[in-house]
Swiss-Prot record:
It is found in: Cell membrane. Residues 266-290 are annotated as: Disordered. Mediates both low-affinity uptake and efflux of sugar across the plasma membrane. Residues 1-9, 66-72, 127-133, 189-192 are extracellular. The gene is SWEET14. This is Bidirectional sugar transporter SWEET14. It comes from Oryza sativa subsp. indica. Residues 13-98, 134-217 form the MtN3/slv domain.
Length: 303
């Protein structure tokens, strides 16, 4: 690391700043897991974002290990692996049996199966610089697919004319993170680090523009099933869009779920429900909505 700071002082500075920003983003879900711990329940939250974040961190550590002078990528993604593993462990402790089974299968499929296959193919079918090229494009492809996830949140903001699903502070911090890591990749002449962050910056600017456009608008009332349709997701355990969660934007999970659970608009019944019958259907709809919006967040870790 000392050699890097002497040869690329600006790259070291941007890499260090990127480490700080990304580390703070990793810690963003802490309030969510504090709620899970206090309530002894996962409350409809998904494990998908954390499994994908762990997979991304593993990929970038492997990539950094194949190169020289990539200590800054190793440090932040190592921290990410530890933090995401803790999140997943806590989730497994308090999740219902069905969610535990789904999370275990997802871990085996993605973090063991897919990562193991990538490791095996790059070691057996390529060597030297070619191995770095192959793995670099794998990392770029994964990062780009993850950055597509914010499209559902952007569409939801446009439909509802409400920015409560998209906090400005989060969009701003993620945009700054993309700029910092782009400059880091540019200065060390690593296109695999720089390229994905161009897309990340673009989505960040779009989100901040939408925030400026709709922050004073009167929100439209959106029913639970409309939110689900806008995010194009399924139930808690089988959300298709959840697989596209981003590594760095996982913080949106807590904010989006809090908003949906506290500000959901319910349909008005003509007849008042019996006092003794709790509105369990509404509770189920709220949980499904929370999972749907959580599955549409964006995240990309330290790259």
């Amino acid at each position: 690391m000392a050699g890097m700071s002497l040869q690329h002082p600006w790259a070291f500075a941007f890499g260090l700043l990127g480490n700080i920003i990304s580390f703070m983003t990793y810690l963003a879900p802490l309030p969510t897991f504090y709620r899970i711990y206090k309530s002894k329940s996962t409350q409809g939250f998904q494990s998908v974002p954390y499994v994908v974040a762990l997979f991304s961190a593993m990929l970038w550590i492997y990539y950094a290990l194949l190169k020289s002078d990539e200590c800054l990528l190793i440090t932040i993604n190592s921290a990410g692996c530890v933090i995401e593993t803790i999140y997943i462990a806590v989730y497994l402790v308090y999740a219902p049996k069905k969610a535990k089974m789904f999370t275990a299968k997802l871990l085996l499929l993605v973090n063991v199966g897919v990562f193991g296959l990538i490791l095996l193919l790059t070691l057996l079918l390529s060597a030297g610089d070619r191995r770095i090229v192959v793995l670099g494009w794998v990392c770029v492809g994964f990062s780009v697919s993850v950055f597509v996830a914010p499209l559902s949140i952007i569409r939801l903001v446009v439909r509802t004319k409400s920015v409560e699903f998209m906090p400005f502070s989060l969009s701003f911090s993620l945009t700054i993170s993309a700029v910092v890591w782009f400059l880091y990749g540019l200065l060390i002449k690593d296109k695999y680090v720089a390229l994905p962050n161009v897309l990340g910056f673009s989505f960040g600017v779009i989100q901040m523009g939408l925030y400026a456009m709709y922050r004073n608008s009167t929100p439209k009332a959106v029913l639970t099933k409309e939110v689900e349709a806008a995010t194009a997701t399924g139930d808690d355990d089988h959300s298709a869009a959840g697989v596209k969660e981003h590594v760095v934007n996982i913080a949106k999970l807590s904010a989006a779920v809090d908003v949906v659970k506290t500000r959901e608009v319910h349909p008005v019944d003509v007849e008042s429900p019996p006092a003794e019958a709790p509105p369990q259907e509404d509770d189920k709809a709220a949980a499904a909505t929370a999972a749907a919006v959580a599955g549409a967040g964006e995240k990309k870790v330290a790259a």
